[in-house]
Swiss-Prot record:
<dbReference type="InterPro" id="IPR006680">
    <property type="entry name" value="Amidohydro-rel"/>
</dbReference>
<dbReference type="Pfam" id="PF01979">
    <property type="entry name" value="Amidohydro_1"/>
</dbReference>
<keyword id="KW-0665">Pyrimidine biosynthesis</keyword>
<keyword id="KW-0378">Hydrolase</keyword>
<dbReference type="InterPro" id="IPR050138">
    <property type="entry name" value="DHOase/Allantoinase_Hydrolase"/>
</dbReference>
<protein>
    <recommendedName>
        <fullName>Putative dihydroorotase</fullName>
        <ecNumber>3.5.2.3</ecNumber>
    </recommendedName>
</protein>
<dbReference type="GO" id="GO:0004151">
    <property type="term" value="F:dihydroorotase activity"/>
</dbReference>
<dbReference type="GO" id="GO:0005737">
    <property type="term" value="C:cytoplasm"/>
</dbReference>
<dbReference type="GO" id="GO:0004038">
    <property type="term" value="F:allantoinase activity"/>
</dbReference>
<dbReference type="GO" id="GO:0044205">
    <property type="term" value="P:'de novo' UMP biosynthetic process"/>
</dbReference>
<comment type="similarity">
    <text>Belongs to the metallo-dependent hydrolases superfamily. DHOase family. Class I DHOase subfamily.</text>
</comment>
<dbReference type="GO" id="GO:0006145">
    <property type="term" value="P:purine nucleobase catabolic process"/>
</dbReference>
<comment type="function">
    <text>Catalyzes the reversible cyclization of carbamoyl aspartate to dihydroorotate.</text>
</comment>
<dbReference type="InterPro" id="IPR011059">
    <property type="entry name" value="Metal-dep_hydrolase_composite"/>
</dbReference>
<dbReference type="InterPro" id="IPR032466">
    <property type="entry name" value="Metal_Hydrolase"/>
</dbReference>
<comment type="pathway">
    <text>Pyrimidine metabolism; UMP biosynthesis via de novo pathway; (S)-dihydroorotate from bicarbonate: step 3/3.</text>
</comment>
<dbReference type="GO" id="GO:0046872">
    <property type="term" value="F:metal ion binding"/>
</dbReference>
Length: 456
């Protein structure tokens, strides 16, 4: 049964589902499903949590079905994020699974892979199960834990990967830390082939990056801030691609931010080596020039690089060298970010702005068509992670994102659903906004003219 506007607002405040209809009809929208090569005006019918049909005649639609008029909007598979920090348990001052889920839904995400930035770390079956249990209680976005690759995230001993996989881990990583132990990474890549689960590596050589604040370039020299050299990333990527080639394991490298990384990844892909890579939105729009303000909201990781790197990254996304775009959501409490640039932590809130930033910086500028943008934000991440999603195929989970491509809005971080209100996008006018997010056929987010609402 469809509920009224006042009841929707009440449910939003209480964190309850907005709608419970078992059947939804989305009429008049531009259906974009890169997995099936679909990009046309079509009717989409969802039933009992699954994609039921496309272009169903009126006579075959139940009369009591919930209906959404999405004329002029884009209907896409729900977005999938490869690396989201939700910070719970242990750092709830930064983010909780509830607030992070609300932010994800408002950004069009239906599935997020949750990094092990928790306390306790996700290096035991109990800690993985705890995150899954909290996420189930929240009942918002789908949360898939990425367990630690090494015990205690110390890069000394391999974690008990088999036990973690059995507990529900969707993959393994020491993110946000890199993996400096070459031998451990090689063993893990070999071992994970038994589970067919991916390993995610954040490429960086710690000894070269230690103490760095921003891109190691002319701007950093002028500002007197220690740099994060491109070589720190390039050398790690070189190691990663060689190990991926040697082991044939499932290795994802990202986020990347340098021309050197792109060059190496492109060359190994041309030889048929299976490796995937991702990039963050902040590396596709802003350069290190923004750090002249000494504003800690621009202290993100990977750091904003010089304009030549930004241009190369954009081209790499367009050409398919970079497979996916991840949000880079690393929430940190305002009292932590409100510090001198060299003392403030890396991090930013990004789930609510990623799609709009890509639409503004890559689609509006004709670098990407909408189909490629959706592929990078949904289809490719689902494929890389090996999870259900990223498609509107009949029988697939009814995870759907509806986008108004012409909705221009000003980013005000204080209005974020995330607990973190630090964002490099603050003050920008972005084009395109999510209007509806459905997870498993349930309407979890709806943007109203007078109130923006996210439901669990």
């Amino acid at each position: 049964m469809v509920v009224g506007q006042r009841e929707r607002k009440r449910r939003c405040i209480r964190g309850e589902p907005l709608m419970n209809d078992t059947t939804w009809v989305l009429d008049g929208g531009r259906l974009i499903d890169p997995a099936n090569g679909i990009d046309r005006i079509a009717r989409l019918v969802l039933h009992e949590g699954k994609v039921h049909s496309i272009d169903t005649p009126d006579g075959d639609v139940p009369p009591d079905a919930g209906r959404l008029d999405v004329t002029g909007k884009i209907v896409a598979p729900g977005l999938v994020d490869l690396a989201t920090e939700l910070r719970e348990p242990g750092s709830e001052e930064d983010e909780t699974i509830q607030t992070g889920s609300n932010a994800a839904l408002a950004g069009g995400y239906t599935t997020v892979l949750c990094c092990s930035s928790t306390k306790p770390l996700m290096d035991s079956a109990a800690s993985v199960q705890l995150v899954r249990q909290i996420a189930q209680r929240v009942d918002g976005v789908r949360v898939l834990p990425i367990a630690c690759l090494s015990k205690g995230r110390q890069a000394e001993q391999m974690a008990e990967l088999g036990i973690l996989a059995a507990a529900g881990a969707a993959g393994f990583s020491d993110t946000p830390r890199p993996m400096p132990n070459d031998a451990l990474l090689k063993r893990a890549l070999d071992y994970c082939r038994m589970f067919d689960l991916p390993i995610f590596d954040r490429p960086e050589v710690p000894e070269l990056a230690d103490g760095g604040v921003m891109h190691d370039g002319q701007i950093g020299l002028i500002l007197g801030l220690k740099g994060l050299p491109t070589e720190a990333e390039d050398l790690a990527v070189a190691r990663d691609v060689r190990l991926a080639e040697a082991t044939k394991g499932r290795l994802h490298v990202g986020p990347v931010s340098t021309m050197g990384s792109i060059d190496m990844i492109g060359r190994v892909k041309s030889r048929g080596i299976h490796i995937s890579a991702s990039v963050c939105p902040h590396n596709l729009f802003g350069s290190d020039e923004l750090l002249r303000s000494y504003d800690s909201r621009y202290k993100v990781h990977p750091p904003m690089r010089s304009p030549s790197h930004v241009e190369a990254l954009r081209n790499a996304v367009a050409e398919g060298v970079i497979d996916a775009i991840e949000s880079g959501h690393m929430p940190r409490a305002q009292e932590k970010k409100a510090n001198d640039l060299d003392l403030a932590p890396f991090g930013a809130s990004a789930l609510e702005t990623t799609l709009a930033a890509i639409a503004t910086d890559l689609v509006e500028t004709k670098i990407l068509p909408w189909s490629r943008a959706i592929e990078c934000l949904s289809t490719a991440p689902a494929r890389i992670a090996g999870v259900k999603g990223g498609t509107l195929s009949v029988g697939a989970n009814a995870d759907v994102t509806v986008i108004d491509p012409l909705n221009a809005w000003s980013v005000e971080a204080k209005e974020f659903r995330s607990r973190c209100h630090s964002s490099p996008m603050t003050g920008r006018t972005l084009t395109a906004r999510v209007t509806h997010t459905l997870v498993g056929g349930r309407l979890k987010f709806e943007l109203h003219p007078t109130v923006a609402s996210a439901a669990s």
